[in-house]
Amino acid sequence: GTEYTAPHILIETGGRPKKLGIPGEEYALDSNGFFALEEMPKRVVFVGAGYIAAELAGTLHGLGAETHWAFRHERPLRSFDDMLSEKVVERYQEMGMQIHPNATPAKIEKTAQNEYVITFENGESITTDAVIFGTGRQPNTDQLGLENTKVALDEKGYVKVDKFQNTTQNGIYAVGDVIGKIDLTPVAIAAGRRLSERLFNGQTDLYLDYNLVPTVVFTHPPVATIGLTEKAALEEYGEDQVKIYRSSFTPMYFAL
């Protein structure tokens, strides 16, 4: 192969959909497969508690598919405040989506009628036209040859970096999904810009603060957050230092 050398090398190889390792998982689609669909399934089961499953389930349900959303724990979107994830589930159920909490997939089988049956560890099974996994992503670090460097990875394969995006090898940096902090494209861009300003424009103290990044999940309705969740704030500052305010309102008649 061709050898390249440089004083600065940036790892920004992103991630890929994570497999569950269950029998019959080859019958399931991931987020890439979802966007390759040529026709809409009439019945669909989404598995996963994060952004991908939440958004895509809402999309197909809104288009008229019989939609099931299954996730391993009591509630989805667990990095958000309870009140937000509860509202998403409540609204989806009002719209007719079928929600399956505490449902861990055990296997997927294909029938003679070209249908799929997904069975969960709790014994529940659902017959459907498509199963779509939104069960997280894993970093693309396993084929980079990092074992030939001093770049350290964590137990999940993410590149370890400090607040300046430095890895444990001088001259090698990493940003984006490959570091496992906040897997959002604008965050990777912002981190990369700050890194380039630091390396090439003399702003030696510039770095991205990952603690105050706004994020939105495009569910129906969409939900957004920034900063600490209520639980995290209470754990960090104590109940006597945290005040919780809640407000609700009726949407305007002319609102879209």
Label the model's feature ranges.
Residues 177-184, 218-219, 250-255:
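Glycine-rich phosphate/pyrophosphate-binding beta-alpha loops
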Residues 25-41, 125-202:
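FAD-site-proximal beta/loop scaffold in flavoenzymes
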Residues 3-14, 45-47, 67, 126-136, ...:
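Short hydrophobic core segments
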Residues 13, 30-32, 71, 101-103, ...:
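Short loop/edge segments at beta-strand edges and connector loops
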